[in-house]
């Protein structure tokens, strides 16, 4: 566990407290810590309430989108959501190339961001998980309805670093012609 473990939850049920004691640590980032609960759901505990408000608000607004995990509970300081398994896009690209199916999913994801009315049409490669069936799930949405970023800058940067940006853009150009 990090030396910076500065989280606290108030007014949690005894069942949730027990579940947390039995949970497996999945990871810790700048904004929170995530555990896998025994019921195969994930709980994210946030450091700052402002980040919790933003992420829980986004996940509630996008609840019908297949690209985001289902949210089960959002109470001050934490979110219980669907566990997202799979391979992070950045790690996937280290092992292999971007294929047409994955290009299509990434393109559909960007179109979904626009459909959802996001002002921030951007996501980091490390926040995109490739599922066994090659669909995508996104974790850690941030500022999607607040900050204006009109193109997927972080995604493009990640694809460029792995020499895959041209392949993706060529696919998009080809599909847009149709």
Regions found by a protein language model. Name each.
Residues 1-22, 158-178:
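Juxta-kinase regulatory segment immediately upstream of eukaryotic protein kinase catalytic domains
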Residues 34-36, 42-44, 68, 80, ...:
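Short hydrophobic-acidic sequence motifs that mark active-site Asp/Glu residues
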Residues 27, 70-74, 120-121:
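Short beta-strand
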Residues 119, 132-178:
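C-lobe/activation-segment region of protein kinase-like
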Residues 90-136, 152:
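Conserved kinase catalytic-core helix
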Residues 2-57:
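ATP-binding glycine-rich loop module of kinase domains
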Residues 60-63, 67-103:
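Conserved structural core of kinase catalytic domains
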């Amino acid at each position: 566990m990090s030396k910076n473990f500065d989280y606290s939850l108030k007014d949690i049920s005894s069942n949730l407290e027990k579940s947390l004691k039995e949970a497996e640590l999945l990871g810790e980032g700048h904004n929170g810590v995530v555990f896998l609960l025994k019921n195969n759901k994930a709980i994210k505990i946030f450091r700052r309430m402002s980040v919790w408000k933003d992420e829980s608000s986004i996940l509630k607004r996008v609840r019908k989108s297949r690209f985001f995990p289902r949210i089960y509970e959002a109470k001050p300081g934490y979110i219980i959501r669907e566990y997202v398994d799979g391979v992070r896009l950045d790690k996937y690209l280290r092992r292999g190339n971007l294929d047409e199916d994955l290009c299509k999913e990434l393109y559909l994801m960007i179109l979904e961001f626009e459909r959802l009315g996001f002002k921030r049409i951007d996501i980091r490669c490390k926040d995109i998980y490739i599922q066994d069936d090659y669909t995508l799930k996104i974790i850690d949405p941030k500022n999607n309805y607040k900050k204006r970023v009109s193109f997927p800058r972080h995604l493009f940067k990640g694809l460029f670093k792995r020499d895959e940006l041209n392949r993706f853009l060529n696919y998009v150009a080809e599909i847009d012609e149709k």
